[in-house]
């Protein structure tokens, strides 16, 4: 089949790589425009655009994907993975077989923009990938294929996204194979079972140390390595970012929620139930440091707070 591909971040680039290794032809790639990125705010291309140029594929980066509807109509299907815009009907139905989306959850669970982070933050032990034929709703289209993936207890959001992208690429190729052969079956979603995964906000980043240690750990790993969970200390101007933690299971005295204890190059924080060990953190304007390196140059006493 000849397909058009729309996607933007690294998740989508991984899906595109898998598609390029299949027997299907990618006739067009659509990605978001170049934009200022990183701490230096230098203009840079998104990962999908970089991959398209590297592979010599036709590339469009319109302000609105609707501008590409005419080009999309020359393809058998439009494939979407984390593109970053809601598609209007003129784009959804432009290709001969419509549009198919690779979504990083087991729909109808976790519809929306942040399914990977939300699943980990909720302590889910399993997630997956769903390929749907897109309709005009938010991740509401009929299911073409699902693949289940376990979530290990210490896996980060970045690690899970990478895994789901690889699984999603394989699932997408299988869907296109079935679509081409006329054997693809679609199943309606049960919207009564739907849950939602809105974009991560600043409030979602703030650590509440009065929660259970496992929930705090899940929040930190969900937001690592790109977003970061945040906390504050009276002696530090601005938020501290916490990048890696583990639930501390060794015997020791209980710590009050937010209370700090440092020793032997290790840093512990009390929670409502249990203790979290901070493994990697970052001061405002600084670089990420392991706990031992951080403690060699800094001293934190007292308590952390929201």
Curated annotation (Swiss-Prot):
Catalysis performed (reactions): L-methionyl-tRNA(fMet) + (6R)-10-formyltetrahydrofolate = N-formyl-L-methionyl-tRNA(fMet) + (6S)-5,6,7,8-tetrahydrofolate + H(+)
Enzyme class, spelled out: transferase
Name of the protein this chain belongs to: Methionyl-tRNA formyltransferase
Gene name in the database record: fmt
This enzyme's EC code(s): 2.1.2.9
PANTHER family, per the entry: METHIONYL-TRNA FORMYLTRANSFERASE, METHIONYL-TRNA FORMYLTRANSFERASE, MITOCHONDRIAL
Gene Ontology molecular function terms on file: methionyl-tRNA formyltransferase activity
InterPro entries: Fmt, Formyl_trans_C, Formyl_transf_N, Formyl_transf_N_sf, Formyl_transferase-like_C_sf, GART_AS, Met-tRNA-FMT_C, Met-tRNA-FMT_N
Record-level GO cellular component terms: cytosol
Family listed: Belongs to the Fmt family.
Cited CDD domains: FMT_core_Met-tRNA-FMT_N, Met_tRNA_FMT_C
A Pfam family recorded for this sequence: Formyl_trans_N
Protein keywords: Protein biosynthesis, Transferase
Residues annotated to bind (6S)-5,6,7,8-tetrahydrofolate: 105-108
Function: Attaches a formyl group to the free amino group of methionyl-tRNA(fMet). The formyl group appears to play a dual role in the initiator identity of N-formylmethionyl-tRNA by promoting its recognition by IF2 and preventing the misappropriation of this tRNA by the elongation apparatus.
Cross-referenced NCBIfam families: fmt
S-S pairs: none
